[in-house]
Amino acid sequence: MFMFRNCAVLLVIGSICCFIYGLFRLHVEVEPNACRMTYMFGEPMFAKVGVRDGDQYPNYALYYYYEGLRQPLDPLKRRMTGAPVIFVPGNAGSYKQVRSLASVALRKAMSNDAGIHLDYYTIDYDEELSALYGGYLHRQQSYLKLCIRTILSIYEGRTEQPSIVLIGHSMGGKLAQSVLVDPAIGQHINTIISISTPLDQPVLNLDTQLEEFYDQTDAVLSKLRTATVPTMTTNVCDSLHQRPPSVQRMASQDSSARLDNVLLISTGGGNRDLLVRPGLTSSRFNDLHAMTSAIPKVSLSCDHLSAVWCLQFMQAINRFLFSVAYVREDRSSIAFGTNKQRNLQTALSTFVKPRRRQQNTVRFGAAGNWHEERRLVINKYFTNGLKGTFFDLIGLQRQERYRKAAIEALNVDDEDWLFGCSAEDNNKTGQLYCEKATSLMHLVQWLPNEDREPRSIALLDLHNLRKTYVHWTHLLVRLPPSAKRIGYNLDIYDPKERVTDIKMPRWYTMAKLPLINETLQGTLHHRVRISEMVDPYQSIRVIVEPLQCINPEYRVTARICVPWAAGFERFQTLKSFDQKPQLYVNVPTLVPRHYNTTLNPVTLELYLDPTCRYRISYEYSYSSALSRLVLEFYGWLPAHLVCVLLIVLRKQVETFYDVGTFRSLRPYVGYLQYTSLYIVTACRLLKKLIISSRVFPEPEPLDYSINVSIVIHCAAIALSLLATLGTWLALTLYGNAFYRLALRITRLSQATSNVMISIMTHLPITYGILTIATAMGTCSGVGLLLAFVFYFLMLSNAYKDYLEDFLWQKAANLVRGKPSAVTEQEDATEEQNEEQNALKQNDEQKQQQQEEEEPEACVGLQNFSFHVTLLLMLFVQLLLNAPSSLAWLRSRRHGINLPDPSLYPSIVVLASLSLLLQLRAPQKCQGYWMLSIAFYILAGVVLLYCQAAIYRLTYVIAGAFALLSAHQSLWILWGRVSRV
């Protein structure tokens, strides 16, 4: 038992250190921001647009964006000819965030020969915290519908009513998606682009209003739109460009859902976005998802705020919008095309860069610089560029085992450079050439290379090419004239030598494992397939160490593909010896149930610099895994903290120390524990029983490793200890400071506050009446704040009084128990000896009387450890109500009444707390074993039902307070009845 206790303590300490290190690495070791700033070329101007029936939303507004015009512009009085786009800001977002998008569109319209231009509108939501308080969302959704109707009325003079594009950032993307639940509005929506939006579930589920908003949107869209759900056989790495089910049904003319004609595009910021993690940015109702690190000509990670001003990303979005817009036949206005399949292909070209299926035939003459290559490895560069077109023919007839070819072109932008053809002899020169050739650019993939020379590569199966095109004899590489360095690389190889299968290392695997001891010179491509990578916190560090390079700078591009997560393709780049030669591989979402990762592994494609030789190894990345664990699961911390407090309270409620002992002074009694870890393991088994029995509600579907729960729970234990010690210091040292702060906030005089504290200390029921009335008159958070302040001051005064009595008692005991000075004088009288003997006899008699009397137990406010735990639970309840309190505070100035989702649980907490103080709880009584069982059950409920749905914790805390007050009340009532 002693060994087990020591191991448990070490486990708690180790988990705490892991959590702190993961938190540190998450915020410190972040890749640099490579976004370029978007600058306005004219003064940004916002013209307010009057919204019909918008008077009921006094704090909202609709604006039209324009630049440079000195005179005010009113879209309602002016003929608008552009294609309408609405920008919807998100959590605490400003309507002015549209500037980057709209300014890029204005510049692009000036250089557009077709005359296409866009009209950008933006909504002012008063920078409301819509991600923290769900009561905002229904109001914002209703106002967005009014804005759409108003904008449609501006363009109602057209022969055809235009369709609108919605661009939403953060929670604005969810609002844009939610308007589709109204078919009357949905039929006017052309495309919705969401930027870093938690689409299918919120980042933190903090109240019932937020959960209801997501559930209602999901339920309606399930009926009106075709959903895409990964199955056991899904593998997007084998078919990256498969069409979504909605488009397939439309193309086959099956009975398609009503809203399948709306194109939904979602984007995620990648590793730099610490507010909305990548796994939340996709939706099962989407047609296309892309990470900014994989978008062509963007190829970087954006944090949550830079996603709305990153120039490369803004250009990509506007490039798509201009591609789907067209000028009407009468050239009177601009509109967005309504052919969804065509728009989707354009979106794929912009955000994914798909393989182009159409193959065009190009004719070449015999004139030109023609060459034939038969080598397996070719590295051909022209440092000073080319004055004319250069042709290289690569024979298809190879040995049987050399069936794969990787061909890379450098500094060839968008021109066709790869073809297949049937070569013939030139009668004049005797050289081979191709009269006509078929483009293979649909097999070419563009690779990000930061600001260096563009890379594009094609991976070809020579056997399939020979079978498909029997008459072909050669591949043709055409390099256009260029003043820059240009060239290409060729690597023909046996695919068995370039594919390596590995398993995800276990977390206890400490060693670095070899992958390739040394690559051959000229190696261009290598594929690594990783099985058993199933959890989003798991991470592998792949070390690509250059052993010898011709040039001081090299280039390695890694492409990571997760087979069950469409649109989460990511690229990473290594480019110099100064950079750490490491890549990180992880997955954005949990693997689907019963998914076989051996048949469909995570794929890591390594595109190497052929002028280098490399040593490649891999290991379990503890630093990356811990940072991802914190990022993915920090939302579980409140539930585990409440679980710890319940287990601590279960122990404290039946533990009574004697008055005057040192233990009674320690409010952290019970927090140095590890027994709450038993609840974590027990809930894993209990969850399976609940699911199989189908009697109780189904627990939250959080099928993660138990290691995650242990680390988060140990972090909660540490947090509870820190909170308790902080409360102890505040009670002891800073009680007066908090008292003065409370006086300044409440603006009460010291005499008045002293009277109120005295009344509430001696008659705590008035404390409950005051706080409950405040909660019902304002909001629950204000009542809880008032209760917390008074409870803290009452506890601080009681602790100071008790500490003062304790010190005086100890001092008196020392004085009484101090032996009289033994005089060494020989002339000491017998009277002094008799007096000393009399004093000793009196002290012995008093000591015997004290031993015979039963020691007094610490009850009421003297049981400080119990009340400190109640104070912390009240503080947790206050924090859970903070978003709704902020919403109430902001809405007061506009006279808006918003729902208070936690009012009733807060009233229960306030009433129970006042009753406990009135009864001087806790009292020594019977029945604490039943209360302990109830607290165990509540702790299990927290871990089964409240880790993701954080708002349910308010009901659990209210239940704990109610059980405590009911137990104390029934015992006192039973005692009085039994006396009668």
Curated annotation (Swiss-Prot):
TM region positions: 8-28, 629-649, 710-730, 775-795, 868-888, 896-916, 930-950, 955-975
GO MF annotation list: deacylase activity; phosphatidylinositol deacylase activity
Active site (record annotation): 170
UniProt-annotated stretches for the region Disordered: 821-853
EC numbers: 3.1.-.-
Regions of compositional bias (Acidic residues) in chain numbering: 824-834
UniProt entry tagged with the keyword DNA-binding: no
Residue positions with a glycan: 427, 517, 596
Membrane topology: Multi-pass membrane protein
GO cellular component: endoplasmic reticulum; endoplasmic reticulum membrane
Family note: Belongs to the GPI inositol-deacylase family.
Protein name: GPI inositol-deacylase
Phylogenetic lineage: Eukaryota, Metazoa, Ecdysozoa, Arthropoda, Hexapoda
Gene: PGAP1
